[in-house]
Regions:
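Signature of N-terminal electron-transfer/Fe-S-associated modules in redox systems
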Residues: 1-230
Length: 230
């Protein structure tokens, strides 16, 4: 059964044609080489499934049927087993994703600190709702749950990089800068936000050396830790 695609109003999934097309020979060879490195990290092959799914997204931009088939083959799993995992976690996208995934935290603290207002403003500004993508293919917008950064609420994530203490205006500027092609630096971590596919490769375990370019744990977090130790 095919599980990947856009859901229609009737509840059916429409699957992009390229989702089922075989990989080009050179692309598949590169995938298999990267997969071998991932699998070698684990005592059991099936344990490599999560990073393997990120690898699929680094190649295709979302979880494709061909990616599912290749993961199943390489890990000695059924396609149903792979599909079950890929449909459980929200980081795995079942239809083409934008270059940047912008997630607005609307969990309790972020919501009361302004997350709901940010969501309404940026959703209206972009003309899209949850898990929808702008017509230019650049921004996919999401409501997200807590990212363990409550001391910087409200928080917006872009390809899983932190943008702390956001406002409706700052978030609208963020998405406008991304769409105009400007380099955008998150509050913490790397010196700029990379694309969804580039970040997916990092999440597959192929580090790009950017994580420590900026501050990691910020002052408020460290102050809280010090109080907890007293």
């Amino acid at each position: 059964m095919e599980h990947y695609g856009l859901q229609t109003a009737a509840g059916h999934l429409t699957v992009p044609a390229e989702s089922k097309e075989p990989y080009a020979a050179d692309v598949e060879a590169g995938f298999r080489a990267d997969a071998a490195q991932i699998i070698a990290r684990y005592p059991q092959k099936r344990s490599a499934l999560l990073p393997m799914l990120h690898l699929v997204q680094s190649v295709d931009g979302y979880i494709t049927g061909r990616g599912i088939d290749l993961c199943a083959e390489l890990l000695d799993l059924s396609t149903a087993e792979v599909s079950g995992v890929a449909t459980f976690y929200t980081q795995y996208k079942r239809h083409p994703n934008g270059r940047y995934t912008v997630g607005v935290c609307t969990n309790t603290l972020c919501a009361v600190m302004g997350g709901d207002a940010i969501w309404e403003a940026v959703s209206e500004h972009l003309g899209i709702g949850h898990d929808e993508t702008t017509d230019d293919g650049l921004i996919t917008l999401e409501r997200i749950e807590c990212n363990a950064a409550c001391d910087f609420a409200p928080v917006v994530m872009t390809n899983w990089e932190f943008f702390d203490n956001q406002t409706p205006d700052s978030t609208i500027k963020l998405v406008d800068d991304l769409r105009s092609g400007q380099d955008v630096r998150p509050t913490r971590g790397p010196d700029k936000v990379v694309s969804f596919q580039e970040m997916s490769r990092v999440l597959a375990g192929f580090l790009d050396g950017r994580a420590d370019q900026g501050p990691g744990a910020a002052g408020a977090s460290l102050a809280g830790l010090a109080v907890a130790h007293e």
